[in-house]
């Protein structure tokens, strides 16, 4: 290792230790070897109105001759606001070339959030809208970025026919084997559910895990069979990954599963996957449904999917 590299490495380690000491649990290590870190920043620790996740990767040349590579992740941050904040961070780097700047960046972002909280109130419908090209967090990210937004879709009444025990009981949650493709990681989580309240309970429990809470997207779908009405109560959530929730629910319909919910967490790694991301989301879900015996073997499930595609093609052919 060159002398300059050794010096940079030492300075990076000292800065990382300082950030961990200053910010405690707010600072987290995503990939120690790749020097990727993330910190959750808010306007107020006790009662946050605005929150943002800053992800940084420290190149070998930092802090000597190169800035940290950074990403900003917040559901409300877009357009001119994002550009202004990025310009502010880059200006700090230019004014402090050769110096450690992570602390300055964090406190600048905090100042922006405090100013924003004094000027405006967060809207009632603020929710994740991070598209694939936005910022995200990777495999071992463990910091929360306002997961409550994903729970808003679950404000419905509980059926009076459900017992109090059913309503209050948190079902067991299983976690599938992650799928990683081009630095994006997908992992499915499954729980048996018999009422909407349990859906909300499962989501709340999952969000206690900081890694899951800070996933770029937590897509979910559930199907509950109502025996008295012989109908299904079902719903889904994209969590910013457009159409992913509907595709996941459609998969569950094809597989004819019932009384189960599946959540698929995605940690975006900075490389666009295009349509492959939907394939990975559904594969994660199908794998765990098969593993937990909610459907047939992988081979039979594949046949069911193929049959459904054929039916759709035949239907389209007949329409012409």
Swiss-Prot record:
SMART domains in the cross-refs: RWD (SM00591)
Biased composition (Basic residues): 306-320
Primary localisation category: cytoplasm
GO cellular component, one term: cytoplasm
Tissue note: Widely expressed. Expressed at high level in brain.
Modified residues (Phosphoserine): 297
Chain positions covered by the region annotation Disordered: 296-320
RWD domain location: 14-116
Compartments, as annotated in UniProt: Cytoplasm
Keyword terms: Actin-binding, Cytoplasm, Differentiation, Neurogenesis, Phosphoprotein, Repressor, Stress response, Translation regulation
Entry-linked PROSITE patterns: RWD, UPF0029
Pfam families on file: RWD (PF05773), UPF0029 (PF01205)
GO biological process: cellular response to amino acid starvation; GCN2-mediated signaling; intracellular signal transduction; negative regulation of transcription by RNA polymerase II; neuron projection extension; positive regulation of neuron differentiation; regulation of cytoplasmic translational initiation in response to stress; regulation of translational initiation
Alphabetical list of SUPFAM superfamilies matching this protein: Ribosomal protein S5 domain 2-like (SSF54211), UBC-like (SSF54495)
GO molecular function, one term: actin binding
Note: In contrast to the mouse or rabbit ortholog, the IMPACT locus is not imprinted in human.
Family (UniProt): Belongs to the IMPACT family.
Its job: Translational regulator that ensures constant high levels of translation upon a variety of stress conditions, such as amino acid starvation, UV-C irradiation, proteasome inhibitor treatment and glucose deprivation. Plays a role as a negative regulator of the EIF2AK4/GCN2 kinase activity; impairs GCN1-mediated EIF2AK4/GCN2 activation, and hence EIF2AK4/GCN2-mediated eIF-2-alpha phosphorylation and subsequent down-regulation of protein synthesis.
Subunit structure: Interacts with GCN1; prevents the interaction of GCN1 with EIF2AK4/GCN2 and inhibits EIF2AK4/GCN2 kinase activity. Interaction with RPL39; this interaction occurs in a GCN1-independent manner. Associates with ribosomes; this interaction occurs in a GCN1-independent manner. Associates with actin; this interaction occurs in a GCN1-independent manner.
Name of this chain's protein: Protein IMPACT
Species this chain originates from: Homo sapiens
Lineage of the species this protein comes from: Eukaryota, Metazoa, Chordata, Craniata, Vertebrata
């Amino acid at each position: 290792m060159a002398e300059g590299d050794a010096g940079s490495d030492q300075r990076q380690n000292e800065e990382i230790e300082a950030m961990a000491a200053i910010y405690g649990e707010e600072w987290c290590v995503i990939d120690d070897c790749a020097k990727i870190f993330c910190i959750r920043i808010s306007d107020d620790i006790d009662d946050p109105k605005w929150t943002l996740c800053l992800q940084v990767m420290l190149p070998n040349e930092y802090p000597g001759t190169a800035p940290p590579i950074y990403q900003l992740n917040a559901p409300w941050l877009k357009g001119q606001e994002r550009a202004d904040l990025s310009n502010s961070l880059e200006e700090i780097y230019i004014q402090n070339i050769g110096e450690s700047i992570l602390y300055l960046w964090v406190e600048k972002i905090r100042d922006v959030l405090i100013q924003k909280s004094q000027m405006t109130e967060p809207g009632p419908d603020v929710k994740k809208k991070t598209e694939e090209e936005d910022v995200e967090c990777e495999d071992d990210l463990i910091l929360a970025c306002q997961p409550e937004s994903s729970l808003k879709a679950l404000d419905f009444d509980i059926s009076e026919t459900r017992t109090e025990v059913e309503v209050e009981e948190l079902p067991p949650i299983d976690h599938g084997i992650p799928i990683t493709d081009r630095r994006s990681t997908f992992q499915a989580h499954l729980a048996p559910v018999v009422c909407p309240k349990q859906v909300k309970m499962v989501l709340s429990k999952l969000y206690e895990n900081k890694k899951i809470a800070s996933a770029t997207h937590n897509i979910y779908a559930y199907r509950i069979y109502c025996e008295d009405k012989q109908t299904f109560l079902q719903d889904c959530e994209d969590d910013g990954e457009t159409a992913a929730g509907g595709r996941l629910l459609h998969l569950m319909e094809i597989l004819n599963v019932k009384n189960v919910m599946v959540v698929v967490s995605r940690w975006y790694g900075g490389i666009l996957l295009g349509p492959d991301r939907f394939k990975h989301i559904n594969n994660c879900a199908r794998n765990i449904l098969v593993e937990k015996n909610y459907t047939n073997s992988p081979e039979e499930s594949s046949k069911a999917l193929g049959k459904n595609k054929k039916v759709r093609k035949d239907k389209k052919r007949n329409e012409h």
